[in-house]
Amino acid sequence: PGRYMHLSEPRTCFMTGKLLQIPASVTPWIRFPLFWLSCHNLPMWLYQLLVNRVLKHDGYFVTYFHPWEFYPLGEHPEFKMPFIIRNHSGKGMEERLDVLIRKLKEKGYAFMTYSEFAQIKLAELNKPDEK
């Protein structure tokens, strides 16, 4: 988990030279990562609570999922995948993501691609200071 917290870097979008870095969201203060593995293993109510805190604090939430997470890994012991990866994989992950999206849409949050998000953030970061 420590490798996902990047304690020496900003929690939110930042520039490295001319490159916009868009890190996956972590909670304010303790920097708990809210990426795919958290969605697999946290109770859904807790994951949603943490996502809502990030949205209130940062104004946006960034996460990602891998295609294999939607495959029923639990049905294949020969893969020898750890429980934290098999947990809620396949249909379970599909249902969790569906619930998350529906709840966020009910609250009026917009969804967009990384490219769309990058365009908005780059415009904000490149806006001249108004004084």
Task: Enumerate the language-model features and the residues they cover.
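Active-site-adjacent pocket scaffolds in enzyme catalytic domains
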Residues: P1-Y64
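C-terminal domain-boundary segment and adjacent tail
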Residues: N41-K131
